[in-house]
From Swiss-Prot:
It is an enzyme of class 6 (ligase). It comes from Aster yellows witches'-broom phytoplasma (strain AYWB). This is Asparagine--tRNA ligase. It comes from the Bacteria. GO terms for biological process: asparaginyl-tRNA aminoacylation. The lineage of its organism: Bacteria, Bacillati, Mycoplasmatota, Mollicutes, Acholeplasmatales.
Length: 503
């Protein structure tokens, strides 16, 4: 029977003394006079499975070409037991892919309680001494240079198995809560976040376009069909300037005001020229939107979602997280368990958080005054030194938040929330949306946001508008917290960052 290494480690008693077939890659090999030990890994589990190869002399040995073709016989169950140690040594290299047929046997060794006694080994893919992942510790900086191979290491195998679990746990949470999954556009004329850091896309001939220094903010009152350099975008594919999306929120709002509760989960893009450990040009965002939902309910959904995902990862990837606890972030398991069991995340107002920071007697690089957005150093102080746990910051000054956020009765703040996490800083940003049409138009005018491309968005208030709320979760930032790593480049398989696009 063909099984995975994960199957064996989870329930070895089901396979003892049975003939099994498995595939994998050589992580290491050790040679003795009459034995060869192979550490095999197929990517399904953290640990390697030990394969023990003994000389079998009852048949004529095969040459290397026949040895490589042995796969055909294995698949047809026509092969005799065939292991020649000398031939095996000639072709066995770290990184090679193998098919192994043998018997699972128990051992008296606590570190390797079981092993495969090999009867047949087929070489599926060769490797050589230039293979960069030799059995030694490699730095993460080095491994980023070989992103196409780093998933074969113990560290990155663990990271991307956790990523898989977290991804589907998010879907599972919202499906169980009665949300509908929707797909929002990748190509958009709008800057939903108002950040202005957009990737513009065009089918015009770039060889004859004049060079421009900046991409205009799509919300600024400029002519959408021409640029300051005289480029006629009426001749472009869409007849106007368009960009890669920075958020699916606006479209998700439209869908929520018909389906009640929706979420979108996909890639977003930001042309921020930053080389920090927290920023990437392409990243994944999860964005739920809920009709008939106020800010307090919004906070509750965010907390329940995160606790569900953390619990699922602890349940399904405990060995991976345990490995990361030992190698990357001491105390990771305890930290995750504490947050998963937290009754209610702390909630403080922006003014309260600002006062805590100002009274901290800590010298921050970024100044503190009412109306300033909190910097990473401020977020980490609050979560790691003061509260020492996650905290919602609510009721932010309206001047530093987006136009669509609902004004509070004081008319100075908006019903916005940022969820700050230890080690990560801002993990979630969201708000109750402004449902009052006249107030929304007034805010757009104050922020000099053109209504022309957003008449459809205003229609959501004209026709059956209601209170509604939502938030955005930076998926990679969640993964940084789940894995104990400290760089966004290490939780994305093929990261796209400023001046870095190789794979």
């Amino acid at each position: 029977m063909k099984i995975s290494i994960k199957d064996i480690f989870q329930k070895p008693e089901l396979f003892y003394q049975k003939k099994i077939l498995l595939n994998g890659w050589v992580r290491n090999c050790r040679y003795q006079k009459k034995l060869i030990f192979i550490d095999l890994n197929d990517g399904t589990f953290l640990e390697n499975l030990q394969i023990v190869c003994k000389e079998i002399k009852n048949i004529e040995t095969a040459d290397i070409n026949e040895f490589q073709e042995n796969q055909k016989f294995n698949n047809n169950n026509k092969s005799s037991n065939n292991i020649n140690l000398e031939k095996l040594k000639e072709i066995l290299q770290i990184g090679a892919s193998l098919q192994v047929e043998g018997i699972l046997k128990a051992t008296n060794n606590l570190k390797t309680p079981f092993e495969i006694s090999a009867q047949n080994i087929s070489l599926l893919g060769t490797s050589d001494f230039s293979y960069p992942l030799q059995p030694k510790k490699h730095s993460k900086v080095f491994l980023r240079q070989i992103s196409h191979l780093r998933v074969r290491t113990k560290l990155f195998g663990a990271v991307f198995r956790i990523r898989n679990t977290a991804f589907f746990a998010l879907h599972s949470f919202f499906q169980k809560k009665g949300f509908f999954h929707i797909n929002t556009p990748i190509i958009t004329p709008n800057d939903g976040e108002g950040v202005g850091e957009l990737f513009q896309i065009t089918t015009l001939n770039l060889e004859v376009l004049p060079q421009t220094k900046n991409i205009p903010n799509a919300f600024k009152p400029v002519n959408e069909n021409t640029s300051k350099k005289g480029i006629d975008y009426k001749k472009d594919f869409f007849g106007k300037k368009v960009f890669l999306t920075v958020t699916g929120q606006l479209e998700a709002e439209a869908m929520a005001l018909g389906l009640n509760k929706v979420y979108t989960f996909g890639p977003t893009f930001r042309s921020e020229k930053s080389n920090t450990t927290r920023h990437a040009a392409e990243f994944w965002m999860l964005e739920p939107e809920m009709a008939f939902c106020d800010l307090s309910q919004n906070l509750k959904v965010a907390q329940e979602m995160l606790q569900f995902v953390i619990s699922k990862c602890l349940e399904q990837n405990y060995q991976d997280i345990e490995f990361l606890d030992k190698t990357e972030k001491n105390g990771l398991i305890e930290e995750l368990q504490n947050i998963a069991e937290e009754k209610e995340f702390l909630t403080v107002k922006y003014e309260q958080a600002l006062e805590i920071l100002q009274k901290s007697n800590t010298k921050f690089e970024n100044p503190l005054f009412y109306g300033v957005d909190l910097a990473t150093e401020h977020e980490k102080y609050l979560t790691e030194k003061h509260f020492k746990k996650p905290v919602f910051i609510v009721d932010w000054p309206k001047e530093i938040k987006a136009f669509y956020m609902k004004n509070n009765p004081d008319q100075k703040t908006v019903a916005a929330m940022d969820l700050l996490f230890p080690r990560v800083g801002e993990l979630i940003g969201g708000s109750q949306r402004e449902e009052n049409l006249s107030v929304l138009i007034e805010k757009m005018n104050q922020m000099k946001i053109s209504q022309k491309d957003l008449e459809w968005y205003l229609d959501l208030r004209r026709f059956g508008g209601c209170i509604h709320s939502g938030f955005g979760l930076g998926f990679e930032r969640l993964l940084i917290f789940l894995t104990g790593l400290d760089n966004i480049r290490d939780v994305i398989a093929f990261p796209r960052t400023y001046h870095n696009l190789v794979f």
